Amino acid sequence: MPITGTVLRRFITKGVIPMCQVAPLSTSAEGSTNLKEVLSKKIPAHNAKVKSFRAEHGNTVVQSVNIDMIYGGMRSMKGMVTETSVLDPEEGIRFRGYSIPECQKLLPKAKGGEEPLPEAIWWLLCTGDVPSEAQTAAITKEWNARADLPTHVVRMLDNFPDNLHPMAQFIAAIAALNNESKFAGAYARGVAKASYWEYAYEDSMDLLAKLPTVAAIIYRNLYRDGSAVSVIDPKKDWSANFSSMLGYDDPLFAELMRLYLVIHSDHEGGNVSAHTSHLVGSALSDPYLAFSAAMAGLAGPLHGLANQEVLVFLNKIVGEIGFNYTEEQLKEWVWKHLKSGQVVPGYGHAVLRKTDPRYECQREFALKHLPNDDLFKLVSTLYKITPGILLEQGKAKNPWPNVDSHSGVLLQYFGMTEMSFYTVLFGVSRALGCLSQLIWARGMGLPLERPKSHSTEGLIKLAMAAKK
């Protein structure tokens, strides 16, 4: 029996308005293994709740906006509705109200495995319910059945030059799939707006099914001499098939992929990739085009390059002081690095004010499976000394490690040393969040996003008027 999503115990103090992103959904179709059927019950129920909420509180002020927020990238500005996840500064990400440790405990796992299946987090993100084994297996079966790539996309990937970045190839392939868009076809036929989500759902399921194959072809073309990608095994889950297609048959690597794909899947709606997907989708571009645009955002170094920068940082340490260092030597090295005007990559976060739970679960994986790996031991020692150094320096609001501080080391351990491909892995994972958000955006009938912009002169006038 599915477990209904819990409500976070966080309230906006004035007016005591609950944060809607993780409110419980109806469970009218619980037990069904047909995700689309389940959503067909939940979406109308949620829309009725939103309608009632807006009727009562539509004019309630939840935040004032100052000039610095406008110039500062709208950071922390409350301006979006995202139902799938909430980032708590103290607890980290919650997927539909569930923390990462709760997801690790409650979500179905592969037979003999210990990490949650991405198919299960997809069900949770879409419905707010922890799926049963049967519901999770139904997603696996459906993705395996939808995984074939059209010939033109395979040919395009095979004809890309070797020096074209893997993210550029990934973005192009996703966009090229849009000739199969059911959403675009339905819109052209003039289907009712209330049905948009159904076609967004179909495109999202198709795209999720195909992304591992797209990513694997890119990987093998660039780094494995163009060797053929293995066919989908209907007996394997999404992550196991992805691992095999990449050329990694170690069951433990498949376990790492399950963990990686789950913990990177969603992170609210304001990050660059999720916001881009939402923005482009709000113009009623189909999910292929919206997600392709999202991946262009993820390709930016400020969003998707962080785990690579951590590895460069670690290799720099090893190159200068080796692996036979003392804690004191490492402290001296970090201080020297900071005093030269540089930062410690993988530490700090725009929202979080504690160690990222996504870091912690990767650390637990490493402690269990690769405790004696030299790079992992370096990461562990940095975890021990760096927060204190950053606090003493006095510049960091959050001196604790984030998810990017660890993921690259795990991939390196299993032999995936091609850092330029890591963002593609991130993209495959982030599809789970972006596309579940997109389905709900269409289901809720969210409008075209169109904020008001001002020139600096216009803001000066507004500021002067506000002071009168």
From Swiss-Prot:
PROSITE patterns: CITRATE_SYNTHASE. It catalyses: oxaloacetate + acetyl-CoA + H2O = citrate + CoA + H(+). GO terms for biological process: carbohydrate metabolic process; citrate metabolic process; tricarboxylic acid cycle. It comes from the Eukaryota. GO terms for cellular component: mitochondrial matrix. Pathway: Carbohydrate metabolism; tricarboxylic acid cycle; isocitrate from oxaloacetate: step 1/2. Keywords: Mitochondrion, Transferase, Transit peptide, Tricarboxylic acid cycle. The keyword Mitochondrion applies. The keyword Mitochondrion applies. Pfam families: Citrate_synt. Gene3D superfamilies: Citrate Synthase, domain 1, Cytochrome P450-Terp, domain 2. It is found in: Mitochondrion matrix. Belongs to the citrate synthase family. PANTHER family: CITRATE SYNTHASE, CITRATE SYNTHASE, MITOCHONDRIAL. This is Probable citrate synthase, mitochondrial. It comes from Caenorhabditis briggsae.
